[in-house]
Amino acid sequence: MISPGKSWFVILITLGELALFGLLADAGDPDNIFLRGAQRPRPILNIAHAGAASLAPQNTLASGWKAFQIGADLWGVDTRLTKDGVFVLMHDGTLDRTTDVEAIFPERAPWRVGDFTVHELKMLDAGSWFVRTDPFGQIKSGEVPEVDQHAYVGEKIPTLREALEFTREHDWRIDIEVKVVDDVSKEEIAQQLVTLIEEAGMEVWVLVSSFDHQLLREVKRLDPRIPIAALVIVAPWNPVEYLEELQADVYAPSPVGFTSGFVARLGALGFGVHLWTYNAVSQLRQFVSMEGVSGIYTDFPQRLEPILDELFDVDAH
């Protein structure tokens, strides 16, 4: 049994924790829905992975537009630096899978992104591969109209600046996953990224994510308004302590990087928890019902959206 004196102490500590959480929740711009403790437009966010990647070429403005039309809360993009230091949207370290680089620059193998200038990248077709390979089988199933297929031919690789401008024009949000390269320092990458975000006026409309947590530390140091998400494969030994030390706002684990109890605990502490990447309707339904989950990355935002609408009946925009 707790003595009266100790009970008052426990109450004071509990109230102190609640007050701290309240400060976290009220801190910053109300539009900044990714900060730890912030209010979201709905309990779980529909995060279009590389845009609506099942319906349009990944990491293009076309896939972003599709995701926006569907009603996704944000789109997630991958970004890398070009030879001349420009951030562009590209998942792979090389260009051959998702562009016609082999035909345009046959002598430049292995076609690393960092070996090309942004001008050279703008010469490439980043859309035809999607029509040719139908990576998610959605063309075969009739989900991608012929008019869209024709429009994707010749689609260009966007710069991150263009993606930010597109997002801002549509009063939307974006998750920027930063791919780190060995020949550019993390400090330099972080400084250039933060400057670009600030110039675009997107500090509270972005989430910066990365597997490189030292880069995230630097982003947070440069501008505490910018939310950061720790991408992980396997959970850290002491996840809460680690995330607090990192000043992370969001924990983004792989399928082996979380348990239901752990997710619930993080959610109760105000951290966002974004799970990746799930496409099957059965998986989407399973994880939207998991306590503590605040976002799901999916290549099929068109599948997740009706599930969230059914649960929350809130207009994402």
Where are these regions (language model features)?
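Phosphate-group recognition and catalysis centered on beta-loop-alpha active-site segments
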Residues: 2-317
